[in-house]
Amino acid sequence: FETNVGAGLPIINTINDLIHSGDKILKIEAVLSGTLNYIFNKISADIPFSRTIRMAQEERYSEPDPRIDLSGKDVIRKLVILAREAGYRLEQEDVEKHLFVPDDFFSGTLEDFWKKVPTLDADFEERRQVLEAEHKHWRFVARLENGKASVGLQEVDASHPFYNLEGSNNIILLTTERYREYPMMIQGY
């Protein structure tokens, strides 16, 4: 069960241990898709968005159909698991989605997707240049706070714990009654 979220990191056991010791989970913030983290770490002036998706597929980080990863469904499923373990009632339909690929890219064939996805490259490159100038990175973040859940692409600066997340790593921050000022962080593959 532990391997369902965070690539086998001790996230679920940690949440259970905190709760059983009398603590309460107040907020969960996490990067839970190694595939999406890989993609957003690879985008550069030389490697456009569409190419990073292809690279993730070639290196077997992504599903054979990368639209599954890009849809955020896997991250939503993982967030729901964590929320339930933390004592919250949550269904996948309750999670607010802020996706970065238009809905119409998810319909049609995989071949259709590969033909359309390069049309996103210019917009991603324009924004990437701004982020680079502002010393920020993209991260696809799952969040649970005050019983509300969301997933979406966020821009994080160098002061954020997610900024230096490399490769296909996962990271989770647990804010609890005990770890309020300095959230507990679990990071790795």
Regions picked out by a protein language model, each given a short descriptive name:
Residues 29, 37, 55, 140-189:
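Catalytic, metal-anchored helix/loop core of enzyme active sites in primary metabolism
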Residues 42-43, 51-164:
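Substrate-binding/catalytic subdomain of NAD(P)-dependent oxidoreductase enzymes
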Residues 2-59, 73-74, 81:
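Rossmann-like NAD(P)H-binding beta-loop-alpha module
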Residues 14-18, 126-127, 159-162, 172-173:
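Intrinsically disordered, low-complexity boundary segments flanking structured domains
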